Amino acid sequence: MSGRGKQGGKARAKAKSRSSRAGLQFPVGRVHRLLRKGNYAERVGAGAPVYLAAVLEYLTAEILELAGNAARDNKKTRIIPRHLQLAVRNDEELNKLLGGVTIAQGGVLPNIQAVLLPKKTESHKPGKNK
């Protein structure tokens, strides 16, 4: 009989996601699928979704860290859109990157023009004018 013999072959290894292989939290498989379905190019390389997922994860972590700092400065434990707005607009590089982006319920940065501020008057001290 030509059988397979004993099933002493190697057991199949546990499946490991591409995200965990790359050490990422963002889904590499989903990014790959979106790149393929988005008609950006005829073919998509294996490294492209890993790189893009890593960039997206880094930018998200950067914004969330700054927004968390803004929330802590306002003595809040929950990040709201206002904190995201303050985080992005107070950071020079993120503000340039997201210059054309409107954050809903974000408000505006507090800013008063210098000409509108009250003028500081010189106080007359005795003994100075002679």
Curated annotation (Swiss-Prot):
Glycyl lysine isopeptide (Lys-Gly) (interchain with G-Cter in ubiquitin) cross-link, renumbered residues: K14, K16, K120
InterPro entries for the chain: Histone-fold (IPR009072), Histone_H2A (IPR002119), Histone_H2A/H2B/H3 (IPR007125), Histone_H2A_C (IPR032454), Histone_H2A_CS (IPR032458)
Annotated positions of the N6-(beta-hydroxybutyryl)lysine modification: K10, K14, K37, K96, K119
Keyword ATP-binding (UniProt): no
Stated consequence of mutating A53T: In a breast cancer sample; somatic mutation
Residues recorded with modification Citrulline: R4
Name of this chain's protein: Histone H2A type 2-B
High-level lineage: Eukaryota, Metazoa, Chordata, Craniata, Vertebrata
Gene (UniProt): H2AC21
